[in-house]
Amino acid sequence: MRDNSTFIQGLRSLGMDLNKHQLEQFEIYYDLLIEWNSFMNLTAITEYEEVIQKHFLDSLSLIKSYQIKTGDTLLDMGTGAGFPGIPLKIAYPDLNVLLMDSLNKRINFLNEVINRLELKNISAMHGRAEEQARKLDFREKFDIVVSRAVARTASLAELCLPYVKKGGYFIPYKSGKVTEELEEAEYALECLGGKLEEKVTFSLPDTDMERTLICIKKVKETPKSYPRAGGKPLKMPLIRKK
């Protein structure tokens, strides 16, 4: 077993405490990440301590803006190597998780992690956000949708809010200051049925990396015309014309 003192200290700074089995699951996850990263592009961060800080603890920092409840349904949009969805599932075993990504080879990796960690009530799905949001099985079905994908908040809101049930939350993870980006996203939130509740800015434990969690509540149903097809949410985000 590796020296997890940095991880344990970081968890405590988040008000969390994991048992031995959960810590072992994170170690296996790391080993699989490095193994698969040798033949496919999953992460540029490979040192154990750095993965702990910039992937594991960053993923778990969700608790700074949202208190996970037993039986919550969570969608991780554009999950990539499984962040933040898999760390959240390890820490909260009762969480129901769907990981979605547009690259099928990543889904193979995610399924391997799910199987090796013997995680239940979690699945990985290959698909594009614009297409899957049209399906009744997914539209407005989740208590919380999260994303660490690098895109403007207005774009992410159009891709993610259609999946959030009324009264639920969409929470994107962002780097640094987001004031201008949030001002830009105001019109998109109006169109999509979202309302900004708060933004929480903090530094990751033992780093000077500034992160912001944007807590957007779903206050009304998203019109059926969203998300727009053909890559429009990313190419032409919903921004108020001046």
Swiss-Prot record:
Predominant cellular place of this UniProt entry's protein: cytoplasm
Name of the featured protein: Ribosomal RNA small subunit methyltransferase G
GO molecular-function terms, A-Z: rRNA (guanine-N7-)-methyltransferase activity
Family: Belongs to the methyltransferase superfamily. RNA methyltransferase RsmG family.
Binding locations of S-adenosyl-L-methionine: 78, 83, 129-130, 148
Role summary: Specifically methylates the N7 position of a guanine in 16S rRNA.
Enzyme Commission number: 2.1.1.-
Recorded GO CC terms: cytosol
Subcellular location: Cytoplasm
Keyword Ion transport: no
Protein's organism: Lachnoclostridium phytofermentans (strain ATCC 700394 / DSM 18823 / ISDg) (Clostridium phytofermentans)
Record's keyword annotation contains Glycoprotein: no
InterPro entries for this protein: rRNA_ssu_MeTfrase_G (IPR003682), SAM-dependent_MTases_sf (IPR029063)
Keywords: Cytoplasm, Methyltransferase, rRNA processing, S-adenosyl-L-methionine, Transferase
One Pfam family recorded for the sequence: GidB
